[in-house]
Amino acid sequence: MAQVPAVGSPFGAECREMWRVPKGYKQVGVDLSGIELRCLGHYLNDQEWMDELLKGDIHWFNAQSFGLVEKGTTKDDNNPEHKKARNTTKTLTYGVLYGAGAAKAGSIVGGNSSKGKKLIDSFINNTPGLSALKKKISRLMAKGHLPALDGRRVWVRSEHAALNTLLQSAGAIIAKQWLIESTKLLQEKEIDAKLLAFVHDETQWEVREDQAEEAARLIEQAATKAGEALKFRCPVNAEGKVGDNWKQTH
């Protein structure tokens, strides 16, 4: 399921239109909003960073942390260089969080590993709490594992992959708790719903047509409840769509 191409990819729309619901029902798709960066926000535990994530423009904030634009620069939406810096930052941010090394980071901006190292070092040093988090992870790695969001042990193959593993595990735990909370709310309200797919940070449901909009709102509410249940420091939100097939609901 996770390998089905996205709507914008070749044959993606046609593939996703094949997942549909019977007459009298609607398909409800709900996605967690920016869960990877919210997981980072939880572990950074820095109010300034979380405010930028939730109320500001975290990618512009990170562009300054990487040194792609000067600190304190006000974003101009009509400036093509600002737009380019912001788009590059999105790629860099997720690349670094997913374990990209200096060579990969450098290639993203058309440079070499030396340039990539400067970018990564700048991001670590200018992101509030990130340097301290990485040092804490290094200390914990002496045991060969990290404590996950819910207390379980997460075994890590190398220190290079430690931050990524910690964030991925947190996202997976949040998503599973979200599914539990969604099921509870749907059952409490006696919603006629069946789970069709649970893919990464997305759920797809078959819901009786007259209950579809209510189901979408309940599943969105369940995301917040999941974060609260796990004492997640960064609010968890979700966005739902109602349609007739997977193309329309994701």
What are these regions (language model features)?
Residues 1-78, 85, 137-202, 217-226:
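Acidic, glycine-rich two-metal-ion catalytic cores of nucleic acid-processing enzymes
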Residues 30-33, 95, 108, 168, ...:
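Generic beta-strand/beta-sheet core signal
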Residues 40, 101-114, 203-219:
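Catalytic palm subdomain of template-directed nucleic-acid polymerases
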Residues 43, 80-99:
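Amphipathic, charged-and-aliphatic alpha-helical interface segments
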Residues 58, 110, 121-124, 136-145, ...:
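A glycine-rich phosphate-binding loop feature that marks nucleotide/adenosyl-phosphate handling sites
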Residues 98-134:
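Extended, well-ordered alpha-helical scaffold/bundle regions in very large, multi-domain proteins
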Residues 104-105, 176, 238:
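Helix-rich, typically C-terminal accessory recognition domains appended to large enzymatic cores
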Residues 125-135, 210-250:
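Polymerase palm active-site segment centered on the conserved acidic dipeptide of motif C
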